[in-house]
């Protein structure tokens, strides 16, 4: 038994270093509604279906209280949908510019494909948004074998496992033990754990780290290591089986997992 399928998240994992396309829009729509939110608050639910992300932000105690202070009432589902409509409109204006593959992604995918591994993908974006992302990413060299969005699973995105299961079905994966899910948020890790597949957090370029490429490269070596260790701990506390610093580390990790699977088989025999 060995790994046959890898499922990658998109923004912050495969493209868009730091996952800035949605974050900047979340900050803007709340600012426009009279409620200032922090970068940390905007990032915390990252990886979820975007309307769920907005609802989760509104439920955060500080934002909830600030919303009530500004609007003189608790937020409503109408507020959620109004914010989401603004989010979608503003995101579509800039989404195409946030589709560059992160370093090592295309080379790693090619290397593992040559070893017979198939690549699926999941996302917190809708079908409509992903039409832009997939088209642009393909022109830049990144195109997984399959994509599932929350739209295709009745809006039951992360942390539900259904997008992973749909990928497994389409790609012919025989066992959850032969599937690795790589993502850059705690929602990705929870999705993988709920699906029973290997949960791997990628650190550099992740939404969880929250730095642009320029910001990360401007850090000293010591500061970079501190940021890496902090992000790694968050993934591990969420339950990740493994973490990798960049996608360049994925082939070696898959060899490690394959050895673990082989040892399990030998132990049973």
Swiss-Prot record:
Catalytic activity: phosphonoacetaldehyde + H2O = acetaldehyde + phosphate + H(+)
Active-site residues, Swiss-Prot/TrEMBL: 9, 50
Highest taxon above the source species: Bacteria
Keywords: Hydrolase, Magnesium, Metal-binding, Schiff base
Any GO BP annotation: organic phosphonate catabolic process
Record has Magnesium as a keyword: yes
GO molecular function (one): phosphoglycolate phosphatase activity
Binding annotation for Mg(2+): 9, 11, 184
Keyword Magnesium attached: yes
Subunit structure of this chain's protein: Homodimer.
Membership in a protein family: Belongs to the HAD-like hydrolase superfamily. PhnX family.
Function: Involved in phosphonate degradation.
Protein's name according to its UniProt entry: Phosphonoacetaldehyde hydrolase
Gene that encodes it: phnX
